[in-house]
């Protein structure tokens, strides 16, 4: 398969299911301001924190654990700390 075809295939498949290793999930609410909040209150969803990508956007990222900057912490019980020159990161006990 030519390189261009492989790249295009990856670009088509990648956005379909965007989950990171720490339990982050991209969700789409509705166009109203509290769409993500209403989405999370339905069913058995147990998401701790959400962040809308851009103001007025209906897309956002939600974490099953604590959100630190733009990433999800690896497990619950972590705190978000600032590391000089490296930015925000998760500090987890034990």
Curated annotation (Swiss-Prot):
**What UniProt keywords are attached to this protein's entry?**
Acetylcholine receptor inhibiting toxin, Disulfide bond, Gamma-carboxyglutamic acid, Hydroxylation, Ion channel impairing toxin, Neurotoxin, Postsynaptic neurotoxin, Secreted, Signal, Toxin
Quaternary assembly: Hetero-, homo- or pseudo-homodimer (identical sequence, different post-translational modifications). Homodimer of [carboxyGlu-49, hydroxyPro-55]Ms20.3, and heterodimer of [carboxyGlu-49, hydroxyPro-55]Ms20.3 and [carboxy'Glu-50', hydroxy'Pro-56']Ms20.5 may exist.
The signal peptide annotation in the UniProt record is 1-24
Q: Which organism is it from?
A: Conus mustelinus (Weasel cone)
Q: Which parts of this protein are propeptide?
A: 25-45
- Reported function: Alpha-D-conopeptides act on postsynaptic membranes, they bind to the nicotinic acetylcholine receptors (nAChR) and thus inhibit them. Through its two C-terminal domains, this homodimeric protein would bind to two nAChR allosteric sites, located outside the nAChR C-loop of the principal binding face and at the adjacent binding interface in a clockwise direction. This toxin specifically blocks mammalian neuronal nAChR of the alpha-7/CHRNA7 (IC(50)=0.12 nM), alpha-3-beta-2/CHRNA3-CHRNB2 (IC(50)=1.08 nM), and alpha-4-beta-2/CHRNA4-CHRNB2 (IC(50)=4.5 nM) subtypes.
Modified positions (4-carboxyglutamate) in chain numbering: 49
Family affiliation: Belongs to the conotoxin D superfamily.
Q: Which residues carry this modification: 4-hydroxyproline?
A: 55
Q: Which cysteines are joined by disulfide bonds?
A: 63-72, 68-80, 73-90, 78-92
Identify the main location: secreted
Its recorded name reads: Alpha-conotoxin Ms20.3
Its tissue distribution reads:
Expressed by the venom duct.
Q: What is the UniProt domain comment for this protein?
A: The cysteine framework is XX (C-CC-C-CC-C-C-C-C).
Q: What is the lineage of its organism?
A: Eukaryota, Metazoa, Spiralia, Lophotrochozoa, Mollusca
Q: Where is it localised?
A: Secreted
MF-aspect GO terms: acetylcholine receptor inhibitor activity; ion channel regulator activity; toxin activity
Keyword Disulfide bond in annotation: yes
Give the GO cellular component terms, alphabetically.
extracellular region; host cell postsynaptic membrane
């Amino acid at each position: 398969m030519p390189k261009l075809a492989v790249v295009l295939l990856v670009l088509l498949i990648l956005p379909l299911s965007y989950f990171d290793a720490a339990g982050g999930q991209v969700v789409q609410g509705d166009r109203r301001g509290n769409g993500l909040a209403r989405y999370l209150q339905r069913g058995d969803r147990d998401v701790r924190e959400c962040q809308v990508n851009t103001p007025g956007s209906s897309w956002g990222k939600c974490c099953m654990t604590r959100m630190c900057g733009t990433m999800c912490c690896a497990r619950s019980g972590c705190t978000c700390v600032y590391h000089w020159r490296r930015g925000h990161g998760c500090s987890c006990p034990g």
